[in-house]
C-alpha cells in the first residue's frame, strides 16, 4: 500500500513540474507577443501603493482617501450649473503642471476663460487646448494624447457637450436616440486600457439632467449613458451651498461660495466622504482657508476666542487674518500642511522632505496671486 502511495506521489510531482514548465513557457510567449507585464502574479504588485496626484485641494485629497486622484484611472466630476466643476478640474491642471507634468484640456463647451485659469495657477502657455467640432473628434484627440504616453492629465469639459457628428450634420428636431450613449460607450472601451497603461488621469466633467416621470427616488442623472459611470474609478458630486459675504466695503457683496464635494464612487478608498471648500471668485479654492479650518479641527492650529495661534505664536485674529498670515509665510503653510497630511495618513514621515519643494512652490504662487489682487467675474 505504501509503495503504491509513493508511486502516485511521484506521478503527481512529475505532473506538477510539467505544469509549471508549461505555464512558464506560456508566460514567456505572452510576454514576447504582448510585452512585459501583460500577465503577472498579483503578489508581485500587492505591496505597491496606488499612485496619486494631488487634486490641488487639501480637503478633497483627504476625502479621496488616497491623497489625490489615482493615476491611470477615469474620474467623473458632475453637478448643477455654476457649482464649481470646472474650477475643481482646473486646480488639478495647475497641480499637474506644478509637479512637472503636461496637461491637456478638451473644451467641448468652447467656454474656457484663460484669465480665470491663469488666476487659479494654470500655466496657460503650456496648457494643451482643443476645441473640437464634434464629440467623435474630441474623444479621438483625447485618445491620441493618451496613447502618446507623454500627457499626465486630460480634462474633457464636458460630456454633455460632446455632440455626435450625425446630430451636428442633421436638422434641429431630428431624433437621434442613444447616439451619444453609444459614442461614449465605445470611447470608454477604447480609452480605458490605454489610460491605465500610460498612467494618465482622465477627468470627464459632466452636467445634470432630470428623468421625466420619476415619482420616487432621485430624478437626477448625467447624460452620456451608463458607460462613464461604470468605467470611472472616482465620481465627484460638486454642489455650491451658501454665498460667502465680504468684509468692510464688500460686506454686502458676495465674494465666493461654500461648496461641498461628495465622493459618490471610489474604487481606491472608502467612498461617500465629503470635502467642504470655499471657492472664492477670481481665486478658486481657498487653500489657506481649508488649511486653517482642518488644522484647527485637529488642534494643530489652536483657537482661543477669535485668535488663532500655532506653536504658541499668534498668527491672526479672525480666520481672514490667519489666512492672510499663512499666505505671507509659505514655509509655515508648508509645515502645517505636512502635519495635516501625516495625521490623515496621506503622507509618511519619510515623504515629508520630497513634498516640501512642491508645497513651497504652490504657496509662493498663492502669495503672488494675493499680492496681485486679481479679480475675475464668475
From Swiss-Prot:
Entry GO MF terms: ATP binding; ATP hydrolysis activity; ATP-dependent DNA damage sensor activity; damaged DNA binding; single-stranded DNA binding
Protein residues bound to ATP: 79-86
Primary location recorded for the protein, binned into one broad class: cytoplasm
InterPro entries membership: AAA+_ATPase, DNA_recomb/repair_RecA, DNA_recomb/repair_RecA_CS, P-loop_NTPase, RecA-like_C, RecA-like_N, RecA_ATP-bd, RecA_C_sf
Keywords: ATP-binding, Cytoplasm, DNA damage, DNA recombination, DNA repair, DNA-binding, Nucleotide-binding, SOS response
One Pfam assignment: RecA
Swiss-Prot/TrEMBL GO biological process terms: DNA recombination; DNA repair; SOS response
Residue spans crossing the bilayer: none
PROSITE patterns: RECA_1, RECA_2, RECA_3
Compartments, record wording: Cytoplasm
Listed GO CC annotations: cytosol
Role description: Can catalyze the hydrolysis of ATP in the presence of single-stranded DNA, the ATP-dependent uptake of single-stranded DNA by duplex DNA, and the ATP-dependent hybridization of homologous single-stranded DNAs. It interacts with LexA causing its activation and leading to its autocatalytic cleavage.
PANTHER family: MITOCHONDRIAL DNA REPAIR PROTEIN RECA HOMOLOG-RELATED, RECA
Protein family (similarity comment): Belongs to the RecA family.
Protein name: Protein RecA
Species: Streptococcus pyogenes serotype M5 (strain Manfredo)
Amino acid at each position: 500500500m505504501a509503495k503504491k502511495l509513493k508511486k502516485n506521489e511521484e506521478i503527481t510531482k512529475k505532473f506538477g513540474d510539467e505544469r509549471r514548465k508549461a505555464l512558464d513557457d506560456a508566460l514567456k510567449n505572452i510576454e514576447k507577443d504582448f510585452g512585459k507585464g501583460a500577465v503577472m502574479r498579483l503578489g508581485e504588485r500587492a505591496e505597491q501603493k496606488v499612485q496619486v496626484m494631488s487634486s490641488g485641494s487639501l480637503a478633497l485629497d483627504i476625502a479621496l482617501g488616497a491623497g489625490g486622484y489615482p493615476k491611470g484611472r477615469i474620474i467623473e466630476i458632475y453637478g448643477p450649473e455654476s457649482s464649481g466643476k470646472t474650477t475643481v478640474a482646473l486646480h488639478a491642471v495647475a497641480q499637474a503642471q506644478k509637479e512637472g507634468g503636461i496637461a491637456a484640456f478638451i473644451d467641448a463647451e468652447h467656454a474656457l476663460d484663460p484669465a480665470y485659469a491663469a488666476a487659479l495657477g494654470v500655466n496657460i502657455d503650456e496648457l494643451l487646448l482643443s476645441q473640437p467640432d464634434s464629440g467623435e473628434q474630441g474623444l479621438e484627440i483625447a485618445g491620441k494624447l493618451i496613447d502618446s504616453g507623454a500627457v499626465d492629465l486630460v480634462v474633457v469639459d464636458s460630456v454633455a457637450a460632446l455632440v455626435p457628428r450625425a446630430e451636428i450634420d442633421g436638422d434641429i428636431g431630428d431624433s437621434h436616440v442613444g447616439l451619444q450613449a453609444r459614442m461614449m460607450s465605445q470611447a470608454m472601451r477604447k480609452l480605458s486600457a490605454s489610460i491605465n497603461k500610460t498612467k494618465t488621469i482622465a477627468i470627464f466633467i459632466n452636467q445634470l439632467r432630470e428623468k421625466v416621470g420619476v415619482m420616487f427616488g432621485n430624478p437626477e442623472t448625467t447624460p452620456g449613458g451608463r458607460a462613464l459611470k461604470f468605467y470611472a474609478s472616482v465620481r465627484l458630486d460638486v454642489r455650491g451651498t451658501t454665498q460667502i459675504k465680504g468684509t468692510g466695503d464688500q460686506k454686502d457683496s458676495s465674494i465666493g461660495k461654500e461648496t461641498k464635494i461628495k465622493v459618490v464612487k471610489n474604487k481606491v478608498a472608502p467612498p461617500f466622504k465629503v470635502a467642504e471648500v470655499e471657492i472664492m471668485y477670481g481665486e478658486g479654492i481657498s487653500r489657506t482657508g481649508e488649511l486653517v479650518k482642518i488644522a484647527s479641527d485637529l488642534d494643530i492650529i489652536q483657537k482661543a476666542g477669535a485668535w488663532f495661534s500655532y506653536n504658541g505664536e499668534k498668527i491672526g485674529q479672525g480666520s481672514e487674518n490667519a489666512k492672510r498670515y499663512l499666505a505671507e509665510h509659505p514655509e509655515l503653510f508648508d509645515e502645517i500642511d505636512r502635519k495635516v497630511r501625516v495625521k490623515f495618513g496621506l503622507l509618511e514621515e519619510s515623504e515629508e522632505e520630497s513634498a516640501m519643494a512642491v508645497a513651497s512652490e504652490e504657496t509662493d504662487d498663492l502669495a503672488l496671486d494675493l499680492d496681485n489682487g486679481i479679480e475675475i467675474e464668475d
